[in-house]
Amino acid sequence: MRVLLIGAKGLLGQALAATFSTEDLVAVDRDVIDITDKVALQKFCHEVRPEIVVNAAAYNAVDEIEKNDEAAKQAFVINAEAVGYLAKASIENKALLIHFSTDYVFDGAKDSPYIEADHPKPISVYGRSKLGGEEAILRLAEHGLKYYIIRTSRLFGKSSGAGKKTFVDIVLEAAAQKSELQFIDDEIASPTFVSDLAMAVKEMLMSRPAFGVYHRTNDGYCSWYELAKTVLNESGAYSINHATPDRKYINLRPIASKDLPRPARRPAYSVLQSTKLAPLRHWREALREYIISNHL
Ligand SMILES: NC(=O)c1ccc[n+]([C@@H]2O[C@H](COP(=O)([O-])OP(=O)(O)OC[C@H]3O[C@@H](n4cnc5c(N)ncnc54)[C@H](OP(=O)(O)O)[C@@H]3O)[C@@H](O)[C@H]2O)c1
């Protein structure tokens, strides 16, 4: 299977590159091809002639995009317009396009998990830019584009080089330096291990379900506070809110999102339910594996 992976140096991109390394893989990032350059992208895709195009490129700086007009413009170019270019190049090469989207396309007002058919209603500029990417694909689906739009949430995993740190690593670093930590307790979603997501993508390529929108996250859900607490417990190095010998004491407090003002609004509840495919393993099990193999 000839696979063109775009955004290969990002957090998810690195996990996808590892998972697809046994395939005929061309893994690139912005230094090789900038997806916002329509002509260069089209030429590059014609040269590579992929059967599968996996787009893990995105502009994800949620707060920067909200407060800075230039960043917002960039977000729409990368997350929406360029996705249209990729979709067009995929049709021209008869390739299947796999694209990632986010729980932030929903407003969070629902009190049960969002299913694929729920109507998106983003409450941030980032969310609107990602919805723009979904719409660009759906427009070309009417012209024969083969596609999977995969919505996911709260990615964690190992990221080296230019890849960014995720919440799990940020919590462990903060706990090593401080003894008082506080995290938001009223934003609920599903943490997702990038290696599990990458494997789930590979499985979709084997089983080839119908083209469309899919929800792929680890099973279960939690707040940021509960995730932080689980991370600290799993690391085995900290005792939380009560002193224990041989472990560093951490005073861990839940806070409300209104007490941590940030430029962009986040959905209060954005659990994604998969009605089309079997759920992935529980996030606690995936987190344990990640911490054991990277932090112990
Ligand atoms: N992270 C999460 O928690 C999360 C949650 C839900 C959904 N998602 C979705 O999952 C996907 C992967 O996210 P991620 O967290 O892995 O992203 P990431 O770590 O920010 O990686 C994105 C990659 O895309 C590259 N890129 C950006 N603009 C590009 C361009 N114009 N041309 C080519 N490459 C470009 C970036 O390169 P530079 O470093 O040079 O910019 C970076 O290597 C995205 O679609 C995202 O919306 C992520």
Report the location of each language-model feature:
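N-terminal Rossmann NAD(P)H-binding glycine-rich loop of SDR-like oxidoreductase domains
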Residues: 3-19
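SDR active-site strand-loop-helix element
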Residues: 6, 28, 56-57, 97-102, ...
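Adenosine-cofactor binding site in Rossmann-like domains, unifying the SAM/SAH pocket
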Residues: 21-43
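NAD(P)H-binding glycine-rich loop region in Rossmannoid oxidoreductase-like domains
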Residues: 38-78, 91
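Catalytic helix-loop patch of NAD(P)-dependent Rossmann-fold dehydrogenases
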Residues: 70-77, 81-85, 105-150, 154-156
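NAD(P)-dependent short-chain dehydrogenase/reductase
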Residues: 138-189, 196-199
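Mid/C-terminal beta-alpha module of Rossmann-like enzyme folds, strongest
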Residues: 200, 207-263, 291
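C-terminal amphipathic/interface module of NAD(P)-dependent oxidoreductases
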Residues: 265-296
